[in-house]
């Protein structure tokens, strides 16, 4: 799923950070920046280093204290993403039990007071005393970081957790945790208040005949840590549906016991369609695993399959400690949707398993096409982009010792994964082609059509470039470039309309800020072929300005700006234009998003012109009302008649206003776009850019209240 994260400070006009700020306040501010991943510990050491540094200055953070001081290091953030991550930590433990073959059903409940309960039918956390610890296994995993079965020799062969911190981190960031274990014939219970057990683990009632073993964890997130403690049903639902797809046969249930406060829930079969109604339980179980997943994704894309059935196969190598499941189906769509996972973790940056898949697929299709005479000697080989056009695929590998790397630790690095997946693809898909020659021919014919479109688009681009002899360095006419050639400090503002573009050009910092005005709405790349897309002057201008190319040939090292900022009006039309731009980046320049180079500017809706003191820019009607009430409560006043200025569009702002509100790094708000779950993001883009109005309406209605962190 794609999220936008606030990265630039919210500063009122004229405000300054005084030099006299106390050391204590500086430390507090620095700690908050660490939690929000804006400052590393090393930078903190450099910026706040005392003049004297002795042993007495050293501080060792014991146990869960470190988690509470820097929660962002353990769960990513203290915003909604981090809050939901707490639930995933507990559920991941239950999934580990399922992967080990001991659990078959996980039940998650959102309680009326926004507590969370997770119940599984696994083996139950060990209740015996842990040697050397002097306390039970339950208390050990609740209070010690990196304590659990995944750190020993024989607890789990495969584990889904990246960090393995799990339940102890949930305890660290909760006001209360209730735990119940069904094991060794009894119910065992323990309660934790503010991270500490209220009593030792208690042996309770005997288990009844036929009652399964397992673990129940109920927790309440700490409102002093998190910006919000209100869970989003759809976020959890989407995640658990994906978990069910990736763990064949595992049943996952989600129940929301809160009263629903608004109409319009997009979940089919979920009864929360009227205010006051309670969410019903949704349950997911897929006996065909990722084969069902691909079938589901194809239906979401509303694309027509090229072959009738989803192609799927699986393999295992006990010696290497790796297994793989692969499922795929070609469709009439123009973009590919290949999603990869390692130990059920979404590897949004790809990795060695995806490299093996791509290499084998391209090689196999070309070899088969030549062997069957479909490709002639004079024909050039089909590219990877050609072969994968319209392909929906899921690759899921499970490894004993996964190695994650990349920008966000979501890129698989195990070399054995590449060779294994490549071998499996070559053997299994080769056999499928031999057994289904008619379907194989259709797949290859589609790739040949994609190749022709690609070559036609390339020729059109070359013709355009030959005509554009007056363009400097081949850059688009409309681009007003910046003076700096250092990509790390350069920003490209992609601006809706010539009027706003003119204001942006006047108001910008010409040293580091480039402006590219785009006239009207760009082509919907979700539903356009490559040659049609590349015939669009608007899209060609954007791709040329960015500098990295597109598709399989995209080269992140050639990108000319490390901030690509989409700047559109703060209304529905502006949101649509921003989404069209994001679709282009997601489908054809995705490494830009993965690298953290894509942003959305947040122009204000209102300016409150106080008679005394700095003016305030606000971004929603609700924020206007709140800031207005707070200001009046503090004795502030607005001039009559013109105290509240509403901005109807970027083009209505003067260049000074555009600079002050939307472009000045000291005052602006930017949302950084990043992909947490590529498959969910793919589903969202397909829905937003598709033909059906109703799912889009429901999505917007449900997310209207969450515009500050809405899925892009």
Where are the regions a protein language model picked out?
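GHKL-family ATPase ATP-binding module
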Residues: 2-51, 64, 88, 96-98, ...
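C-terminal interaction appendages of subunits in large macromolecular complexes
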Residues: 3-6, 452-471, 486-491, 502, ...
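Mature N-terminal segment immediately following signal peptide/propeptide cleavage
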Residues: 52-70
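Short conserved segment of the HATPase_c
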Residues: 68, 125-148
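Conserved short strand/loop->alpha-helix "switch" segment adjacent to the catalytic nucleotide/phosphoryl-transfer site
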Residues: 69-87
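Conserved, non-catalytic sequence blocks in retroelement Pol enzymes and Pol-derived host proteins
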Residues: 77, 128-133, 353, 384, ...
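Residues immediately C-terminal
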Residues: 96-97, 124-125, 572-573
């Amino acid at each position: 799923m794609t999220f936008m994260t606030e990265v630039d400070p919210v500063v009122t006009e004229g405000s300054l950070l005084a030099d006299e700020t106390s050391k204590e306040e500086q430390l507090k501010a620095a700690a908050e920046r660490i939690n929000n991943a804006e400052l590393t510990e090393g930078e903190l050491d450099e910026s706040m280093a005392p003049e004297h540094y002795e042993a007495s200055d050293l501080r060792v953070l014991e146990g869960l204290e470190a988690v509470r001081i820097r929660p962002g290091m353990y769960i990513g953030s203290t915003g909604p993403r981090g809050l939901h991550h707490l639930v995933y930590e507990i559920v991941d433990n239950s999934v580990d039990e399922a992967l080990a073959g001991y659990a078959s059903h996980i039940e998650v409940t959102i309680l009326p007071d926004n507590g969370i309960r997770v119940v599984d039918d696994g083996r139950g956390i060990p209740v015996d005393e842990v040697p050397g610890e002097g306390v039970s296994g339950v208390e050990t995993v609740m209070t010690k970081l990196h304590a659990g079965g995944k750190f020993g020799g024989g607890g789990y062969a495969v584990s889904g957790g990246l960090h393995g911190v799990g339940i102890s981190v949930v305890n660290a960031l909760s006001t209360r945790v209730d735990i119940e274990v069904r094991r060794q014939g009894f119910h065992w219970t323990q309660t934790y208040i503010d991270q500490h057990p209220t009593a030792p683990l208690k042996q309770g009632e005997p288990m009844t005949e036929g009652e399964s073993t397992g673990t129940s964890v109920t927790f309440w997130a700490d409102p002093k840590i998190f910006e919000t403690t209100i869970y989003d049903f759809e976020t959890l639902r989407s995640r658990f549906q994906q978990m069910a797809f990736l763990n064949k046969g595992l049943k996952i249930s989600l129940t929301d016991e809160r009263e629903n406060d608004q109409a319009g829930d997009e979940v089919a079969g979920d009864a929360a369609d009227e205010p006051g109604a309670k969410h019903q339980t949704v349950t997911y179980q897929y006996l065909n695993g990722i084969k069902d997943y691909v079938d589901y994704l194809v239906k979401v894309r509303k694309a027509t399959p090229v072959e009738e059935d989803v192609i799927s196969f699986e393999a295992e190598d006990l010696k290497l400690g790796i297994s793989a499941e692969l499922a795929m189906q070609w469709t009439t769509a123009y973009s590919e949707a290949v999603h990869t996972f390692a130990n059920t973790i979404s590897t949004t940056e790809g990795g060695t398993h995806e490299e093996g898949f791509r290499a084998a697929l391209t090689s196999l299709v070309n070899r088969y096409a030549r062997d069957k005479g479909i490709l002639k000697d004079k024909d050039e080989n089909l590219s990877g982009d050609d072969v994968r056009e319209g392909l929906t695929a899921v690759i899921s590998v499970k490894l004993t010792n996964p190695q994650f790397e990349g920008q966000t630790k979501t890129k698989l690095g195990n070399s054995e994964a590449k060779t294994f997946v490549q071998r499996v693809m070559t053997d299994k898909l080769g056999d499928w082609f031999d057994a289904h020659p008619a379907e194989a021919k259709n797949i290859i014919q589609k790739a040949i059509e994609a190749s022709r479109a690609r070559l036609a688009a390339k020729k059109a681009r070359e013709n355009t470039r030959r005509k554009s002899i007056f363009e400097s360095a081949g850059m688009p006419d409309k681009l007003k470039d910046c003076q700096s050639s250092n990509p790390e400090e350069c920003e490209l503002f992609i601006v809706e309309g010539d009027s706003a573009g003119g204001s942006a050009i006047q108001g910008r910092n010409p040293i580091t800020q480039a402006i590219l005005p785009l006239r009207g709405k760009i082509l919907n790349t979700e539903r356009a072929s490559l040659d049609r897309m590349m015939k669009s002057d608007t899209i060609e201008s954007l791709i040329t300005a960015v500098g990295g190319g597109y598709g399989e040939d995209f080269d992140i090292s050639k990108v000319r700006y490390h901030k690509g900022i989409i700047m559109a009006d703060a209304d529905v039309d502006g949101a649509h234009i921003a989404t069209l731009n994001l679709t282009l980046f997601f489908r054809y320049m995705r490494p830009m998003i993965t690298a953290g180079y894509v942003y959305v500017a947040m122009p204000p809706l209102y300016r409150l012109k106080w008679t005394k003191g700095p003016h305030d820019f606000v971004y929603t009607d609700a924020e206007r009302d709140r800031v207005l009430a707070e200001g009046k409560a503090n004795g502030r006043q607005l001039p009559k008649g013109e105290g509240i200025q509403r901005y109807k569009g970027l083009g209505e702002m003067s260049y000074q206003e555009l600079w002050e509100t939307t472009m000045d790094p000291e005052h602006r708000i930017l949302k950084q776009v990043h992909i947490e779950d590529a498959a969910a993001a793919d589903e969202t883009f397909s829905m937003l850019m598709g033909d059906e109005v109703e799912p889009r309406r429901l999505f917007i209605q449900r997310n209207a209240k969450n515009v500050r962190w809405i899925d892009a």
